[in-house]
Amino acid sequence: MNYNEAVEKLKTFNQEHVLRFYEELNEDGKKELLSQIERTDFTVIEQAAEGGKRGKIAPIKAMTLPEIEMGREHFGRIGIEAVRAGKVGAVLLAGGMGTRLGSDAPKGMYDIGISRHVYIFQRVIENLMKVVSKSGNYIQLFVMTSEKNHDATVNFFREHDYFGYDSEYIAFFMQDMAPAADYGGKVYMEAKDCIATSPNGNGGWFLSMKKSGLMELIEKRGIEWLNVFAVDNVLQSIADPVFIGAVLEGGYSVGSKVIRKVSPDEKVGVMCTEDGRPSIVEYIELTDDMLTQKDENGEYAYNFGVILNYLFKVDRLLGLLERKLPYHKSAKKIPYINEKGESVKPDEPNGYKYEQFILDMIQMLDSCL
C-alpha cells in the first residue's frame, strides 16, 4: 500500500489522524505504518456491540462422571480410531505473555518445575504425546501466537527440539489484532509509526488460521475435528479419546469440557443454553437466583464451569466464517501518544478494545455436549 492508498482508506473510516506524524518517520517507519494501515480492519469499530442484551438463559445438561465411566471404553475406542485416522487436530491458544506470572516471556515458556526445568509448552507436548503413543499417529498441532510473542515462541520450540514432537506436525500462526480506539471511535496511536492494537479475543482463532493459509494443511491431513485449548492448564487432557468419542457418538457439532464448580460463587463462566442454543454465561452475569438455583437432583443448576477446552467440527466452523462472528467492545486503559507525540499512560479506562468471543461460536452451533 502506498501513501495515497493509505490516505483513501483512512478517509473512508475517518481515521486520517493515523498519518499525523508520517513526515517525521524514517523510511522503515513509513513502510511499517503503511503496512499496518493496509492490514488493519477498521470496520470492527462500527461492528462492535457493548455488552448487548442476552437472550433467555437456562441451565444445560452435561454428561456426568458416572455416565463417562460407564461409556469410557466405548467412547475411548471411537476417539482413538478418529485420532489414528488423522481426523483430529489440536489448536493451542498461546498468544498471551506471562505477565501475571512475573515473566516478560510468552506464558508457555514459563518454568513450573521444582527440582528440574519443566516448561508449560513442554507439559502440553507431554500431554499430547500420551494420545500419540496410544494411537500410533501424530496429531497435527496448531500453535496460535501473537505479534508480541511469535518469534520467541517459535524459537523456543526449535531450541528445545519441539520437546520430542515431530516438527512436521507443528504449525504456528499469529492471532489477528484489532485496533484500540477512544470512546468516539478514533483509533489510538501507540507510537508515531504504530496504531494501538490488541489481540482480537479467543473467538478469532479459526479466522486467523484461515488467513494464515492453514486450511490447505487441514484438508491435506484430512482433519475433521479441532480440539481447541488454552495454554494455562497444564493438567488437562488434550485430544482426549473419551471426550472425542462421546462427541462423535452423540452427533454433536461441538463439545465442551467442564468441571463442577467448587462453590456456587466460584468466579468461572458456566455452560448454559441461551434461547435454546448452547452458550456460556460469564460469572459476572450470574444473578443471585441463578447462583442458588438447583435442579431436580438437588444439585446447583449452573454448576458446569468452562475450562476453555472445546472440540469443534471443521465443516461447521467453515460455515461460521460466512456468518461472521460479532465483535464486542470493553472499556480498557490504553496507553497512547497525544497530538504532541507525548506518551500517555492513563490511570482510568480511556477507550475500547475489541474482541470476538468463543461463546458466540458455540451459540451459532445447534448442539453441544
Q: Which role does the model predict for each range below?
A:
Residues 3-171, 179, 189-206, 214-215, ...:
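N-terminal glycine-rich phosphate-binding loop and ensuing alpha1 helix
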Residues 84, 91, 103, 115-122, ...:
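Conserved structured core elements
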Residues 87-91, 108, 138-143, 169-171, ...:
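Beta-sheet entry/capping signal
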Residues 91-103, 182, 287-290, 329-336:
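Active-site-adjacent bridging/hinge elements
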Residues 95, 146-147, 175-176, 211-212, ...:
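Fold-independent oxyanion-binding glycine-rich loops
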Residues 97-101, 109, 143-144, 148-152, ...:
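Flexible loop/turn segments at secondary-structure boundaries
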Residues 162, 167-266:
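Conserved beta-loop-beta/alpha segment of the NTase-like Rossmann-fold superfamily
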Residues 222-227, 235-239, 244-369:
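Catalytic core of tubulin tyrosine ligase-like
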